[in-house]
């Protein structure tokens, strides 16, 4: 685990409410849409998101999170993890269709450190938190022996894409979105990579 300086720190279970909100911001509403389908009777989509963030395992876990905290409030977050050197084949019978293009893109970058979530609360954007979190992601990638960063973004999210490109990421592949009932102006998922090793 790398050392972090304030306002950055490693995530905790107590960050679950903020992480759920920020993953939904980064995912442009897709997480909330999915959580509504996963909710138990009487459980809200937000409760599902918080429950998933509190898990010790899984891709969306506080254990994979780095947060920026100001005055006791989490205002930005990075969630990421190392991808295996050999991706597992996609099981089209088990994986929901809307995830297949995302998994196809992820599988194109084995051995990288995958930035699953990078989000800043709207009122704190433009202050360098995203750039600094990407710098932390590079340090985490190096500590994990990964060859670079990989990120998937909607083609409609021009602001995020500008940030990633400004930080040295380049487009390497595109896949059409499968939306089902999710509403989003994007048409494609774009895979960006920054090679560091």
Q: Predicted segments — roles?
A:
Residues 7-22, 29-34:
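A short beta-loop-alpha structural element at the N-terminal edge
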Residues 27-53, 64, 90, 99:
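Conserved GNAT-fold acetyl-CoA-binding loop/helix
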Residues 54-67, 83-88, 114:
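A short helix-loop-beta-strand connector motif used in the catalytic cores of GNAT acetyltransferases and
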Residues 67, 73-82, 114, 119:
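Conserved beta-strand in the GNAT
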Residues 82-117, 179-180:
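Conserved acyl-donor/pantetheine-binding loop and adjacent beta-alpha core of acyl/acetyltransferases
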Residues 97-100, 147-150, 154-161, 165-167, ...:
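C-terminal "cap" of GNAT-fold acetyltransferases
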Residues 111-115, 125, 134, 141-152:
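Conserved GNAT acetyl-CoA-binding A-motif
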Residues 120, 126-143, 162-166:
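Conserved acetyl-CoA-binding loop-helix of GNAT-fold acetyltransferases
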């Amino acid at each position: 685990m790398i050392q972090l300086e304030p306002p950055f720190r490693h995530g905790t279970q107590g960050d679950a409410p903020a992480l759920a909100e920020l993953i939904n911001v980064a995912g442009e509403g897709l997480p909330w849409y999915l959580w509504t389908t996963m909710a138990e009777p009487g459980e809200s989509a937000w409760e599902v998101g918080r429950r998933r963030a509190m898990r010790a395992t899984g891709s969306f876990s506080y254990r994979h999170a780095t947060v920026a905290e100001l005055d006791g409030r989490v205002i930005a977050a990075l969630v990421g993890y190392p991808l295996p050197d050999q991706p597992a084949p996609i099981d089209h019978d088990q994986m929901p269709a809307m995830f297949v293009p995302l998994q196809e893109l992820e599988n194109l970058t084995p051995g990288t450190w995958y930035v699953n979530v990078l989000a800043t609360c709207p009122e704190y954007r433009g202050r360098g938190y995203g750039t600094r979190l990407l710098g932390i992601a590079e340090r985490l990638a190096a500590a994990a022996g990964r060859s670079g960063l990989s990120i998937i973004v909607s083609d409609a999210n021009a602001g995020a894409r500008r940030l990633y490109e400004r930080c040295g990421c380049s487009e390497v592949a595109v896949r059409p979105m499968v939306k089902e009932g999710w509403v989003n102006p994007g048409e494609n998922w774009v895979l960006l990579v920054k090679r560091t090793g």
